[in-house]
């Protein structure tokens, strides 16, 4: 599986995630604006953090 792993609005980069079946994108707002984190897997998130998990290559941009 290939997942995006760039932060927020940086140029897209990807990572090969061996053994993973999910990519994730999670985002939240703070004093800096909206922060977006992308990567492999499907993590548990704290209340107030939005999470999108998906199962195809580069689906989490």
UniProtKB/Swiss-Prot annotation:
<dbReference type="Pfam" id="PF21947">
    <property type="entry name" value="Toxin_cobra-type"/>
</dbReference>
<feature type="disulfide bond">
    <location>
        <begin position="54"/>
        <end position="59"/>
    </location>
</feature>
<keyword id="KW-0964">Secreted</keyword>
<feature type="disulfide bond">
    <location>
        <begin position="3"/>
        <end position="23"/>
    </location>
</feature>
<dbReference type="GO" id="GO:0030550">
    <property type="term" value="F:acetylcholine receptor inhibitor activity"/>
</dbReference>
<dbReference type="InterPro" id="IPR054131">
    <property type="entry name" value="Toxin_cobra-type"/>
</dbReference>
<dbReference type="InterPro" id="IPR018354">
    <property type="entry name" value="Snake_toxin_con_site"/>
</dbReference>
<dbReference type="GO" id="GO:0099106">
    <property type="term" value="F:ion channel regulator activity"/>
</dbReference>
<feature type="disulfide bond">
    <location>
        <begin position="17"/>
        <end position="40"/>
    </location>
</feature>
<keyword id="KW-0629">Postsynaptic neurotoxin</keyword>
<keyword id="KW-0800">Toxin</keyword>
<feature type="disulfide bond">
    <location>
        <begin position="42"/>
        <end position="53"/>
    </location>
</feature>
<dbReference type="InterPro" id="IPR003571">
    <property type="entry name" value="Snake_3FTx"/>
</dbReference>
<comment type="similarity">
    <text>Belongs to the three-finger toxin family. Short-chain subfamily. Type I alpha-neurotoxin sub-subfamily.</text>
</comment>
<dbReference type="GO" id="GO:0090729">
    <property type="term" value="F:toxin activity"/>
</dbReference>
<keyword id="KW-0008">Acetylcholine receptor inhibiting toxin</keyword>
<dbReference type="GO" id="GO:0005576">
    <property type="term" value="C:extracellular region"/>
</dbReference>
<dbReference type="InterPro" id="IPR045860">
    <property type="entry name" value="Snake_toxin-like_sf"/>
</dbReference>
<keyword id="KW-1015">Disulfide bond</keyword>
<keyword id="KW-0528">Neurotoxin</keyword>
<keyword id="KW-0872">Ion channel impairing toxin</keyword>
<protein>
    <recommendedName>
        <fullName>Neurotoxin 5</fullName>
    </recommendedName>
</protein>
<comment type="function">
    <text>Binds to muscle nicotinic acetylcholine receptor (nAChR) and inhibit acetylcholine from binding to the receptor, thereby impairing neuromuscular transmission.</text>
</comment>
